[in-house]
Amino acid sequence: LVVVEDGGQGVESAKAAIEALRSSGALAKIVYVPLPKSGRCVAGNKALEAATGQLCCFLDDDDLFYADHLEVLVSEWLKQPTLGAVYSLSYEVRTHVQSEEPWVYQNVMHSLIHRQPFHRPTLWHHNYFPIQTVLFQRKLFEENGGFDLDLENLEDWNLWVRYSLKNDFKLVPKVTSTYRVPDQIEKALQRQAVLDNYYAKAKAKHDLLKVELTLPEIQQIVEEISHQNQVVGVPTSWLKQVVIRTPLLRNLYHPLKKWVSIWRRIRR
């Protein structure tokens, strides 16, 4: 386990908790990397540099692994060790933060938003991997580098696009984790605006990348897109932005989101 503290309440503010965990014997080895406030990309890259295992997986401090998360993903990867990565499903948890100090919050709703089998053209268009859902080979970091320091947002999307250029990913259709999004409309709008601003920046970086495909692989991609009857799907983020910014639709957003989540589960 590698724990990177990005600033926190002063450098090494988590040291006591780490030492207590070490002394408990619950984990064989814990690597603690305290940093001054440096940002997500620096913290993620430091974690990858410190990691020594063959497989890696990220976990932000407000996300949650279920007890079988790593077991499910590792077991699937062992069946096909040539895969660059495997990823599972995750609940998006709408969270109402009542207080940050002390930390008090309420989980408002769980929704299953992303259920997309691996498809490169779709990934080139928009991200459908919550960051904690992906278990990947560390050699991808060694071969392709880590997070792009120019991106303070959508850095994970850029990482997965680069890692998947020469490596296949595979979906494991089981929910094994959760991630949080703000419940308050104002915070949701602010968050979406930031992501929208970074989309063009991340896309511009992707346009400089090159991918090598065989003729059968190109044919397969064309057939898949044709079968879907779309060039590339309209991103969920765009639809969400339209709904939230339309007063008549705004009040229907969360009920519709819940209904769609239930309908998807029934259909599957």
Predicted regions mapped to residue ranges:
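Acidic donor-binding segment of Leloir-type glycosyltransferases
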Residues: 1-34
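Short glycine/serine/threonine-enriched helix-capping/active-site loop
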Residues: 4, 35, 85-90, 172, ...
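Glycine-rich, basic loop-to-helix element that forms the pyrophosphate-binding segment
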Residues: 35-51
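Short aromatic/hydrophobic "clamp" motif used to bind/position activated sugar donors
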Residues: 56
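The conserved acidic donor/metal-binding loop of glycosyltransferases
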Residues: 60-64, 89
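Conserved donor NDP-sugar-binding/catalytic core segment of glycosyltransferases
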Residues: 68-104
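Conserved nucleotide-sugar donor-binding catalytic segment
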Residues: 111-199
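Membrane-proximal basic amphipathic "stem/tether" segments
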Residues: 219-268
